[in-house]
Amino acid sequence: MAQKGSERTIRKVVAENRKARFNYEIVDTYEAGLVLTGTEVKSLREGKANISESYATDEGGEIWLINSYLPEYLQANRFNHETRRRRKLLLSKREVNRLQGAVNREGMSLIPLKIYFNDRGRAKLELALGKGKKLHDKRETSKERDWNRQKNRLLKERG
């Protein structure tokens, strides 16, 4: 029997939206389950998914992932899935209400950050609540990143 204190969460990241942190100021993150078909899970396990152009929206008290790309599973004959279909996200009612309130009142966006398999083998989506950055904010972020690289380089040379 495993002890709870010694358990480590093992995440196998399948798809990551790397531009999201550059284009949005991330306020909060949530872990959501995905409603998938069998061929979609097998396709995800091959690791060729893409969520860089996807987004999440709330419709009828539910959160949906839109425009995510899961390629067809090659070994599935005619029972394959649609590559860019809408996928339902599994969140608690409290989380759904909180996300809907933030999107409707504060003008925030729901951004998918990454899809991964947790330690139990379930496909999960890391969903972020964020505000879009302006152009000057993006420039400031890149300047700060460049300065940190330069600073680390100088410290490495001297130290």
From Swiss-Prot:
Keyword Transport in record: no
Main location: cytoplasm
Keyword Cytoplasm (UniProt): yes
Record Pfam families: SmpB
Gene3D superfamilies to which the protein is assigned, alphabetical: 2.40.280.10
Start and end residues of each stretch annotated as Disordered: 134-159
Alphabetically ordered keywords of this record: Cytoplasm, RNA-binding
An individual GO BP term: trans-translation
Entry's Gene Ontology molecular function annotations: RNA binding
Subcellular location: Cytoplasm
InterPro entries attached to this UniProt entry: SmpB, SsrA-bd_prot, SsrA-bd_prot_CS
Domain of life: Bacteria
SUPFAM superfamilies reported for this sequence: Small protein B (SmpB) (SSF74982)
Basic and acidic residues composition bias: residue spans: 137-159
GO CC term, one of those recorded: cytosol
Family membership noted in the UniProt record: Belongs to the SmpB family.
Cited function: Required for rescue of stalled ribosomes mediated by trans-translation. Binds to transfer-messenger RNA (tmRNA), required for stable association of tmRNA with ribosomes. tmRNA and SmpB together mimic tRNA shape, replacing the anticodon stem-loop with SmpB. tmRNA is encoded by the ssrA gene; the 2 termini fold to resemble tRNA(Ala) and it encodes a 'tag peptide', a short internal open reading frame. During trans-translation Ala-aminoacylated tmRNA acts like a tRNA, entering the A-site of stalled ribosomes, displacing the stalled mRNA.
UniProt xrefs under NCBIfam families: PRK05422.1 (NF003843), smpB (TIGR00086)
Protein name, per record: SsrA-binding protein
Annotated organism of origin: Sinorhizobium fredii (strain NBRC 101917 / NGR234)
Gene: smpB
